[in-house]
């Protein structure tokens, strides 16, 4: 469905951020991208969705393909029309619009009939949004705003959704609820999801496949269940040592982690 083939990303024509990144996202699956802050995860999503141009970045090598069509270099709105949409970190709802007006805005490329169908679909997965349909979205809770951000993305009827840190700032129960809904969407609507997430435990619990990024490179990949059992993942992303006890990131030197990834 989505293939990223050996891409490099440069900002301001001099700053190399991504260095030969390759990934695949299968149809009807969740693929997660893990990594520390600054590893290049969000840049990867922006390279796929076409947002880099607005931030003086560009894909200088490699290719991004959606199905059989190459989309790197396309403008973001054209990528959206082709069936790929990004849900940004921080939710970014239109705070002065109501919940339903946000959804209508997300469906602006659709016909009136399709917008109505889209709203009904969103409300079927997020009934809490239906209860808040006339409420100004700036007064929604953080969890409700995240639901709205995902629902707004669904209004364009995408085939692929890029999710950037959906658990950020949310209580554990809300995180579990939202990830459960995303899993249902993938299974029932045959969506493909590329998930960037700091909560590695939750991400690997819902994902089918995972990648680990460090300093702009993919350093580890595999089925999610295998990654959950990987000793490096346990130690550095799940915070568990070999005996199963919790381990602080501060107890481990960064160079040791790099050496182990690259060995």
Question: Language model features by range: what are they?
Answer:
Residues 2-4, 18:
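Conserved structural motif at the start of ABC-family nucleotide-binding domains
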Residues 34-36:
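The feature captures the beta-strand-to-loop junction immediately N-terminal to the Walker
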């Amino acid at each position: 469905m989505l293939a990223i083939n050996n891409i490099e990303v440069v900002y301001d024509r001099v700053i190399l951020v991504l260095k030969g990144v390759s990934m695949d996202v299968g149809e009807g699956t969740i693929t997660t991208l893990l990594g520390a802050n600054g590893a290049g995860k969000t840049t990867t999503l922006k390279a796929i969705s076409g947002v880099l141009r607005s931030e003086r970045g560009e894909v200088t090598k490699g290719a991004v393909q959606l199905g059989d069509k190459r989309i790197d270099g396309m403008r973001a709105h054209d990528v959206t029309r082709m069936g790929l949409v990004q849900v940004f970190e921080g939710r970014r709802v239109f705070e002065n619009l109501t919940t339903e007006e946000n959804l209508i805005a997300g469906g602006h490329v659709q016909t009136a009939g399709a917008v109505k169908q889209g709203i009904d679909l969103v409300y079927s997965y997020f009934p809490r949004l239906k209860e808040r349909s006339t409420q100004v979205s700036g007064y929604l809770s953080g969890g409700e705003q995240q639901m709205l951000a995902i629902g707004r993305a669904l209004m364009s009827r995408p085939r692929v959704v890029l999710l950037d840190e959906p658990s950020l700032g949310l209580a554990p129960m809300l995180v579990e609820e939202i990830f459960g809904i995303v899993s249902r969407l993938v299974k029932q609507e045959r969506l493909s999801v590329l998930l960037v997430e700091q909560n590695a435990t939750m991400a690997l619990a819902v994902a089918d496949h995972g990648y680990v990024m460090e300093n702009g490179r993919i350093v580890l990949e595999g089925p999610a269940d295998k990654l959950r059992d990987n000793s490096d993942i346990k130690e550095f992303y799940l915070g568990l040592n070999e005996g199963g006890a919790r381990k602080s990131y501060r107890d481990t030197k960064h160079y040791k982690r790099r050496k182990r990834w690259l060995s």
